[in-house]
Amino acid sequence: MLRLLLVRHGETLANQLGFWIGQGESEMTPEGLKSIDWLKEQLRSETFDGVFTSPSQRAVWTSLQLCVPHLISKEEIQQIEALREIDFGRFEGKNFKWVKAHEPDEIEKMLRERSKYVYPEGESLCTQHQRVARWLHEFIQKYEKGNFLICAHGGTIRCILSELLIGNETLHWRFKIDPASLTIVTLTEGYAVIETLNYKQNQV
């Protein structure tokens, strides 16, 4: 059995303020730091056969913290370009309200084209999904069993879940993936089961 522990990085300032931060960087909030400490304790008893992360600083930092109890060094953590968040292009650091006020035509396009909408100078959800899916299938081919930690972004994790369940991006927005949350998926002979979804601190 292959078991994937999918962790979204801790809350960043951009998350808190509602800005789109895809492939750019944003520092962690105090709450984000605390929630990763909590998650580290939840995962202390796990054994990792490998650790993979997006190269974004927020994801790398999250993976490093979670690996401390397991004595896994930074050099042992594999940074994977395909696990990066969507590229918002020139809308990086902006939000829906800003785009609606300054480039309303783009909002109309966004709502009309949905997953095929390409952010100006960036990429579409379709493109992000395809790059994540390519890596995912290579990963599954290479590792038929084991327990793996994957630290990434909300969008990346939704791509993984949608691909595993139906083989495309259609279910992307059906999953809520909060900062510092844990989602666990098991695969047996290619059949994926979501065992835990969006598990986080102070969950009601």
Model-inferred region functions:
Residues 46-49, 140-148:
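Surface-exposed helix-capping loop/turn segments at secondary-structure junctions
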